[in-house]
Curated annotation (Swiss-Prot):
Compartmental location: Cytoplasm
Protein name according to UniProt: Chaperone protein DnaJ
Family annotation (PANTHER family): CHAPERONE PROTEIN DNAJ, DNAJ HOMOLOG 1, MITOCHONDRIAL-RELATED
Record's cofactor remark: Binds 2 Zn(2+) ions per monomer.
């Protein structure tokens, strides 16, 4: 009897996308699964047919061979011109058995043991917490061993035997021509076990969804994007396998005063017009509290002051960066008539021949403008 076209089995056209193939397989496999159609030989055969089609169409290499040669690509010794001979009747299953055993966590007759999944948790902290270090309590959604059955998946007193179909490996290996493929055992769903009476709490899975509370110690100096690995705090493994890890990804909130660049902190410090001209002493904020900073006379906007060791300590070297303060001279606003009059008098006293002495930048700028227009006038003549 001729085999059905694999695309037809999955209800697809030949040009179907990878996602279309996956969706069709999941839908049909669920519909015709033996557990949902107990005692139905027709459903069992259909399920095998669906798995066989997906094993080929779900693999890029096999699909390409099938598209070119059809079922002949997977018949022993035929279809691909050159692959049929040269191996002296070698058993490809034996040749690749060890490889597949390593990949899928067990060889023939051994129960499949799968490490638990790694989990990710995104944690937002303040800049102060990032710089100083802290401890945060978090709650994660994870898979834990079922307390009712101890992770076995079986009710107490129920027999747990090796799956007779896959002999405990959890996978079925098939040889099709020069291809060797493995798929999850449809009888035990990959567990490698045959359970007489599945646990009612976990439905035979051995694991249950659970919320778990953890305390995470955040070291000083972390930054956005840093990951903290908590070994063994991920999802529980299957069949007694070790749990995965939990990765806590740090996100540092923006600060209303400081900006961070590596180990250095930056902030803008406004000072009055008078302090900028005459000099004085001001207080600037740091993450350790207020610190006094001397402002020399004639300080301009943009002047940088470096406060060494007031930045962030490196998580590797422990060396602390600096706090860099950028001065911004603030123009006075909401002036009274008297204050405006005083400023007019000051402006008048600074004008004239002494402008270059009191305002060198303004004087230089005005001289540059005058020369520009003088040269412009000469070029027009």
């Amino acid at each position: 009897m001729a085999k059905k076209d694999y695309y037809e089995v999955l209800g697809l056209q030949k040009g179907a996308s990878e996602d279309d193939i996956k969706r069709a397989y999941k839908r049909l496999a669920s519909k015709h699964h033996p557990d949902k159609n107990q005692g139905s030989k027709e459903a069992e055969e259909k399920f095998k047919e669906i798995n066989e089609a997906y094993e080929v169409l779900g693999d890029d290499q096999k699909r390409a061979a099938y598209d070119q040669y059809g079922h002949a690509a997977f018949e022993q010794g035929g279809g691909t011109g050159g692959f049929g001979g040269g191996f002296g009747g070698a058993d490809f299953g034996d040749m690749f058995g060890d490889i597949f055993g390593d990949i899928f966590g067990g060889g023939r007759g051994r129960q499949r043991v799968v490490r638990g999944e790694d989990l990710r948790y995104d944690l937002e902290i303040s800049l102060e917490e990032a710089v100083k270090g802290t401890t945060k309590d978090i709650q994660i959604n994870t898979l834990a061993h079922c307390d009712s059955c101890g992770g076995s998946g079986a009710e107490k007193g129920s027999k747990v035997e090796t799956c007779p179909h896959c002999h405990g490996s959890g996978r079925i290996r098939r040889q099709q021509g020069f291809f060797v493929s493995e798929s999850i055992c449809p009888t035990c769903h990959g567990s490698g076990k045959k359970i007489e009476k599945p646990c009612r709490s976990c439905h035979g899975e051995g694991r249950v969804h659970k919320k778990e509370n953890l305390s995470v110690k955040i070291p000083a100096g972390v930054d956005t994007g840093n990951q903290l690995r908590l070994a063994g705090k991920g999802a529980a493994g299957e069949n007694g396998a070790p749990a995965g890890d939990l990765y806590v990804v740090i996100h540092v909130r923006e600060h209303n005063i400081f900006e961070r660049d590596g180990s250095n902190l930056y902030c803008e410090v406004p000072i009055s017009f008078a302090t900028a001209a005459l000099g004085g002493e001001i207080e600037v904020p740091t993450l350790d509290g207020r610190v006094k900073l001397k402002i020399p006379a004639e300080t301009q906007t943009g002047k940088l002051f470096r406060m060494r060791g007031k930045g962030v300590a490196s998580t590797r070297s422990g060396y602390a960066g600096d706090l860099i303060c950028r001065i911004v001279v603030e123009t006075p606003v909401n002036l009274t008539s008297e204050q405006k009059e005083l400023l007019h008098k000051l402006e008048e006293s600074l004008q004239g021949k002494d402008l270059s002495k009191h305002a060198p930048k303004s004087s230089g700028f005005l001289d540059g403008v005058k020369k520009f227009f003088d040269n412009l006038g000469k070029s027009d003549k």
